[in-house]
Amino acid sequence: MSRRPRKRHVQLTLDQARKPDGRHGGWRPHAGRKPKAGSISHATRPAEPARFPQHVTLRIAEGAPSLAREGLMKIVRAAIRDSQRGAPQATQGRRAHRAAAADHNVTRELTRRGVSADHGETSELASRGGFRVVEFNVLGNHLHLIVEAASKDALASGVAGLEIRVARRVNAALGRRGKLFPQRYHARALRTPREVRNALRYVLLNRKHHTAAQRFGRFWIDACSSAPWFTGWAQPIRGDEPWKRELLALPPPTAPPETWLLATGWKRHGLLRFDERPG
């Protein structure tokens, strides 16, 4: 009985491996695991000059409750305020102790992630130009931020610190475990006055982008955003409803802009109107 010849295994060159022969697969256009919807590329982020504000988007984990609910909205707003104003210095007694412990946990988590905690964690650092949240809008499953950052590292550590702070507080309030922000954040530099104005309109009036226009009055502002404290409206905000008066009486949770583009430059194209819609 004759033996079958032993199969010869031939080592393919890289060029051969990239050209499928119809039997063995190989590299093909659009082959492999498909990216998840809404996922962000893990390519290295470019280092943007500090003079350019950035539009940052944070997506919430699937299945997590809407952060635009009133109770959670207050938690997120407080986290934004504390991330750049230094909560321990603004509180007393046990509240100060809890705030200091929370800041320590944020710093420890940043260290575990391998992210520098040298930027954007306290009001002292914010005043040195590390990381500032200038405007925001909290929607059901994502957050829009307009921020200023002194460097690429300042942006990374500032966003990471804010994510940790929001996640810890929201999870504690809900008795929830697990990541609240599982995806990488998206960031886009705003390089011109027109780009900055468009981004401000998009962030502050974003709810109009998702909801029918007839739901909004002529002087409507979004209670889940920084619109009540925004100083670039073409008309003064009317305190004609109790919730507006309540918000207007609060100190701003955001930081004032320091870049020319975000403080002054965008106004060349006109102040924002309440009746505008995001593009």
Kindly give the residue locations of the regions a language model identified.
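Short Pro-Cys-Gly-centered "Cys-loop" motif that presents a nucleophilic cysteine in a tight turn
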Residues: 1-54, 58-59, 64-140, 148-279
